Amino acid sequence: MRPPIHKLICKRLADQSSHHSQHLYHQYIVRNLPAVLQMWRIPTDVPQVAVPIGLKLAEVTADTPLDEVFKHWKESGGVILKNILTPAEAHQITTELESRIDSVQRGSRVPHEDLAAFHGAKTKRAGDLINHSATFRERILENDFIHAICQRCFGEDGHNGDYWLSAATTLNASGPQPAQVLHRDLTSYPPYALLGPEGTEPQINFLFAFSDFTDDNGATRIIPGSNKWPFHQRGNMAQTIPAEMKTGDCLLIGGKVIHAMGENKTETERKCIQLTVIPSFLTPAEAHPFIIKLETVKKLSKRAQRFVGFRSQYPRGSPGLWTKDYIELALHLGLDDLQGAMEDLQHVLNQPKQWDTIDYDKM
């Protein structure tokens, strides 16, 4: 079991105070501060000795028990969710988003060589999908299987228990185009580097195939088992395998697994939408409340409204984040009345508070 964040932090504080010596505490700070200040300056001279587990990615469906889904996911760092969309649904979403995608240029607008390479010179990364596709909202944003995975991931092992959408964007990569650099997605949230591979997940990614993913057209490449490696182990492209999928399938990966968009060796476009989900105490990649229209939000369920930041967030042990006058944001936005908001939050009101359940003596 992965130690939850609060236990790792509290244990560190308890260890410090147990020294009963300012001198020892000062030595501890001097010894560890450089590592904190250089969170993601992981040394490059560490021998690269980690090896992949050599597994093919498992394939599951929405009918697969979550225990089995998570077993495969935690073992290799990725799992393929089959037939989440029908080909007709995928085509409908593509059609509804056509004008939105056409309005976005290929390649990055940022004049920075590394960022431009990571973006992909022939890749279209279009956001603001929720306003433009009713089918996307109904079949992805409101998908019960997707939310069940999120609830399990961000609720287990002492995790914060609440989550929201970080980004919903296209990753439409035309070819020919070289592969991305191998990376871990958790680099967006540097403190998680201190927790190591046994820490809780800072984010998860659902990569939906809107065209077939093949080895030749740039299927996401992943190093199975690298989610368990020390973070100074970076792997290499020869250790990766392609996550080949049919249109409508979805690749689920966590923030700790090493992966990259593969090289597109063809003249065709590999079409993808990524749905990135994070604990609701972290900052999303997309500023949804400034992008999604209120008239669109009113068409969503309460769960989806909270998912995109139009309702308050309630991580375990918190009296509420993202509020107005210290109360549910939906009241301020006219999305609910007090009675409706309280009924919706009953599961939050009934949960034990984190500070009531921590046994500090046993940490």
From Swiss-Prot:
Annotated keywords: Dioxygenase, Iron, Metal-binding, Oxidoreductase
The keyword ATP-binding appears for this protein: no
Catalysis: reaction(s): sphingofungin B1 + 2-oxoglutarate + O2 = sphingofungin B + succinate + CO2
InterPro entries per the UniProt record, alphabetical: Phytyl_CoA_dOase-like (IPR008775)
Pathway info: Secondary metabolite biosynthesis
Residues noted as binding Fe cation in the record, renumbered to the chain: 183, 185, 259
UniProt keyword Translocase present: no
Use in biotech settings: The sphingofungins A, B, C, and D, show a limited antifungal spectrum of activity but are especially effective against Cryptococcus species, fungal pathogens causing opportunistic infections in human.
Stored SUPFAM superfamilies: Clavaminate synthase-like (SSF51197)
GO MF terms, alphabetically ordered: dioxygenase activity; metal ion binding
Enzyme Commission designation: 1.14.11.-
Induction line: Expression is positively regulated by the sphingofungins biosynthesis cluster-specific transcription factor sphG.
Cofactor(s) the protein needs: Fe cation
Described function: Dioxygenase; part of the gene cluster that mediates the biosynthesis of sphingofungins, bioactive molecules acting as sphingolipid inhibitors via inhibiting serine palmitoyl transferase (SPT). Sphingofungin biosynthesis starts with the PKS sphB that produces an C18 polyketide precursor 3-hydroxyoctadeca-4,10-dienoyl-ACP containing one delta-6 desaturation and one delta-12 desaturation.
Entry similarity comment: Belongs to the PhyH family.
Official protein name in the record: Dioxygenase sphC
